[in-house]
Amino acid sequence: MSNLITLGDKPGRDNSLFMLIRGAFHLIFVVVYVLFYFANIKDAHTTAKHINNGIPVALTFKEMVKGIYENGFPYLLIIPSYIAMTFAIIFPVIVTLMIAFTNYDFQHLPPNKLLDWVGLTNFTNIWSLSTFRSAFGSVLSWTIIWALSASTLQIVIGIFTAIIANQPFIKGKRIFGVIFLLPWAVPAFITILTFSNMFNDSVGAINTQVLPIFAKFLPFLDGALIPWKTDPTWTKVALIMMQGWLGFPYIYVLTLGILQSIPNDLYEAAYIDGANAWQKFRNITFPMILAVAAPTLISQYTFNFNNFSIMYLFNGGGPGSVGGGAGSTDILISWIYRLTTGTSPQYSMAAAVTLIISIIVISISMIAFKKLHAFDMEDV
């Protein structure tokens, strides 16, 4: 634990990064030890009360084993899960948290250089340094716009297609179901790379095949080549449309299952009361969908907030740059990737941005879950 405080004192011999990682592990071990210590004290206190009250307690080893098997068997089953969660989630989070408060960058790479604790410097640099301030503001604003627009689009398309497919007059529902599931069936990275070629400015199918068809009805498109991959605005439009295509099948399947579970009596009563299609949707269909699927719908926004693959595979975060190593279409998670790769990595700055992302996503998700009563199923 002492090495966690100093992070070494001799370059070349002391690897500050390894010391930090070992210190994080020791910290977890100490916390677990303290928890077990107080749990033993509580158990001893409970046992003493039982003895004083004449309640039988386990005194022999055989009785203790029997008591653990009968009363503690569920805890024995979940211990492996807690151990896995500790090393797969909690441990990396603690290491990331610690790195955010160091000067770990390309100028301080262990073991040749030592790391130092720098406090809140990385967080203040995001606001004080003009390059990072401008990049962070631009990337954060686009990340929010992207998450809201793309998620809302895929949810709207998914609900709309599910409602259409669930209508009794629709024939060949299985065929429509297969068609709607095609974007989900094909691996996302293949679809993204295919769209990347289709949106090519000069030879892509969108500009050379699709737009000429619409030009017959929209004269201003005649002969126009939209710069899908060379203009940041049009690239963002293409990204949002692509995510709508990639994400709606999941919402479609989820919504279709909910629609088929809604009793027809509700719609019949609404019909008798003179409700039109919009009133039925607003007062029956949508509330039922929201009551059941609210956690999943919220998770679509949090997923797209950190949707790295589409940004990286489509155009590498380009075109152009907004400073601070961020591309014009980078979201926060892809900006973090840029900060940790290349010839001048900024690991501590990336860790600081990661913590900011976590705080934003967790806060918004918790507020949304609470406002929508996402886990209150009593009234459904």
Positions of the model-derived regions?
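A structural signal for multi-pass alpha-helical bundles of membrane permease subunits
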Residues: 1-2, 10-30, 37-50, 73-380
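Membrane-interfacial, low-structure loops and terminal tails that flank and connect transmembrane helices
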Residues: 50-69
